[in-house]
Amino acid sequence: MAVGAQGATPAGTYLETAAIGVKEDLADIIYRIDPDETPLVSACSRVAANQVLTEWLVQELNAASDNAQPEGFTAVMQAVLKPVRLNNVCQIIARTVGVSNTLRVVDMAGGEDEYNRQLILRGMEVKRDLELAVTSPLVRTITDPRHMSGLPCYTANGSRGAGAGVMPVGDGSNAGTAGTLRDLTLAMVDSAVQQCWQAGGKPSLGIMSGNVKAYFATLSQGGTGNAVVAQNIQNVTSREQVTIMGAVDVYRTNFGTIDLAPDRFCPIHQIILVSTDYIELAPLPERDIIQQDYAQTGDNSQGGVVFEGCIRPTAPKAHATIFDLNQ
């Protein structure tokens, strides 16, 4: 049975809504949800660059051939296979902040100096911007403002969609030509990994957007282009709860095992397959995500966080990109 409504508030009752001295109830913690995971940047070893245009040499061997020489042969000098000279351009990535000196000393939620807190946030943002730069198929430019080539520009291995699709040359000088979008298949991944393996690489990391990662999990069902040799079955006892496996985090190919890393900053419609032994991040000295305090222009504090450098694929044929995906 419903309870009857109480009577109206008596006249003259002092209510909270009319009170003058009520304090705010503002939590003393500032919560942050925006992510800062950067799988490709984190996977790179760091080897300093010394010039804005950083260059490196890649040596390949002559192809294997039938080699049977006569006894007592006279030496004939064979052609030398010269190393290939590659380069990339150091890009400046910066985030700045200005805070009044008054704001630095008043009592703020979180109990921190607001200038220092903002610098920490700018550092996270620079790292995210760097992840976007190294995973994007944007081509380097030496004119100011300089821009690095992303790893996809160095990947001649992999595949493009049909139609006008053309892979990058593989030296960072172009991004290729887009083709018709198509659905991802395991056959595409297997082919790209085999191309890298044939050239001497061993991809161990797959970088992809969240949409591609979610679609990858559906490929374990088999079907055209998605041959499934074996499926893992998780055994449970009566004391354990049954777990439905709806994710694919590792893909084992005939040429190695790939850790699948969803990347919030990786461009859509592509998968980058990375041989982590052959990829470097090359910052200029004292320019590797550093904090800077700028000169005061008044009653305020100004500063920023700066990275200057580029990605350096030391053996481009060890990597691959699958472009033009529907996902």
Model-derived regions, located:
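Flexible, glycine/threonine- and acidic-rich loop/arm segments that mediate assembly and lattice contacts
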Residues: 2-250, 254-327
